């Protein structure tokens, strides 16, 4: 908990523990005994934003362009020695808590989660109510956490263009999905259509899910690639004939983890999901074709 671990007999409990944007939570602050010599007590609602930044040198134009383009994330290696994971507190609202004759004995405070709230996850944000008590002795700093879950109603969903991230397009790959929104723990289903622009060698086809975090800190230098994670590549077929004028449709089903972090945007970073299809030609000189299509993942 870093700085916020000096509880000194004070506890913060938030209920309900799981909430959606636009719903209200209440923090209850209790103390083992009255806290004396108090000059001020506050409770601040907000979230801790997790992100990466570049601590050495400056990000060049290529790195900045890559960070701005979600379809490039994970494609280019970065200098890991010059980038670090970090976190910053983003306060939303702060309230003064009552103190009487220099003593603090506890309080309650309610908070309505904003409509724009990013969902809780280890990849993006941790929501909390933070207690700070200033006193003549040792100050008290502690927190109570709660989880914000996200449904499709909480997000603006737009159909972003599919992007080619590898190959020359000798065979066009199109990822067709029944929906752009998928829920954590449920499968991602779809079809990949292969359309050769001329006769090509047979192909091996695979698909996987992935998510990336775009780094855009207010003050620090953005990391070149933010963060990136992908699922196992699902092999869909080998020896698939690629002949001009004969498109091939290949269905797929991917398992989405139950703890998949929801799509979201915070002050210092943004989390974006996608499905990527990759195809290898039997003749290695013909290379590889890769495309990505952005999706939205929710967990409520």
Predicted regions and their residues:
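C-terminal beta-sandwich interaction modules and adjacent acidic
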Residues: 1-300
